[in-house]
């Protein structure tokens, strides 16, 4: 099953992926909580999804309790994903004060269910092959014989060229359609007590602030055995800090099972 949003964006919940309908090269992989939040919004459309419903369905059923700010961060991740792959200049998600969030009423939402048996038949069907009726017998001597040989060689060369071009095109398309990891610009700068600390490459020069962030994270009681991969920016301009804690390396696993941690007033210490 997948969704088409406003005729511009495909959302595949199973793969947590947003894809441009018009350009498959534009695609984004959402975090697990953000993907669950978007699924709730689409299933409830055009109704409002209450904040408590998000907390219950996305986090509490997984045994986690998170602050309200974590919900807002995941809605922000969805909005950024929409802007990255969709031909839209306005927000598709509306904030309903003191209630929750919803998809705007004027947005076109379509739910598509894939017929696996039909797809399997389509993909497994053998390619159609055109067979020539054959060569007419010729009565000529060596000249006609040579012409037949040349025709056979030419035909085989054309088939070989078409195969090589097709194989190269398939390889190029496969490589360019791979999802772009959400944390592809993050680098591991330290491994402490089983936790891998990853920051954006453009903030590595600010590592003098790293000890303060590291201490705050470790003191919060993070379980490094369950969520050993930590991703966060070293942004001094923000009073708080958002950390994505995953149980697998996000850049090597499409499903990394991440949760969002929010720390307030980190840069006011």
Curated annotation (Swiss-Prot):
GO terms, molecular function: DNA binding
NAD keyword on record: no
Source superkingdom: Bacteria
PROSITE patterns, alphabetized: OMPR_PHOB (PS51755)
Biological processes annotated in GO: phosphorelay signal transduction system; regulation of DNA-templated transcription
Keywords for the protein's UniProt record, in alphabetical order: DNA-binding, Transcription, Transcription regulation
Annotated region of DNA binding: 3-105
SMART domains noted in UniProt: Trans_reg_C
Family as reported in the entry's similarity comment: To V.cholerae cholera toxin transcriptional activator (ToxR).
Descriptive protein name: Uncharacterized protein YqeI
Organism: Escherichia coli (strain K12)
């Amino acid at each position: 099953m997948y969704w088409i949003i406003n005729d511009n964006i495909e959302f595949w919940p199973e793969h947590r992926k947003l894809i441009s309908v018009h350009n498959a090269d534009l695609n984004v992989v959402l975090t697990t909580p953000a993907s669950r939040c978007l699924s709730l919004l689409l299933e409830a459309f055009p109704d409002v999804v209450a904040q408590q419903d998000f907390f219950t369905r996305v986090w509490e059923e997984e045994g986690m309790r998170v602050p309200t700010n974590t919900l807002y961060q995941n809605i922000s991740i969805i909005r950024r994903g929409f802007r990255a792959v969709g031909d839209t200049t306005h927000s598709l998600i509306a904030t309903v004060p003191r209630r929750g969030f919803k998809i705007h009423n004027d947005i076109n939402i379509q739910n598509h269910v894939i017929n696996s048996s039909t797809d399997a038949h389509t993909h497994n069907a053998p390619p159609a092959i055109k067979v020539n009726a054959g060569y007419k017998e010729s009565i000529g001597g060596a000249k006609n014989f040579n012409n037949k040989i040349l025709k056979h060689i030419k035909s085989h060369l054309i088939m070989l060229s078409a195969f090589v071009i097709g194989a190269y095109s398939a390889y190029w398309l496969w490589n360019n359609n791979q999802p772009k990891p959400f944390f592809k610009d993050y680098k591991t700068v330290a491994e402490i007590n089983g936790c891998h600390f990853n920051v954006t490459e453009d903030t590595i020069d600010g590592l003098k602030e790293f000890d303060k962030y590291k201490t705050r994270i470790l003191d919060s009681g993070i379980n490094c055995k369950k969520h050993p991969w930590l991703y966060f920016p070293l942004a001094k301009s923000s009073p708080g800090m958002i950390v994505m804690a995953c149980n697998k390396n996000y850049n090597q696993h499409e499903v990394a099972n991440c949760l969002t941690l929010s720390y307030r007033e980190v840069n006011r210490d």
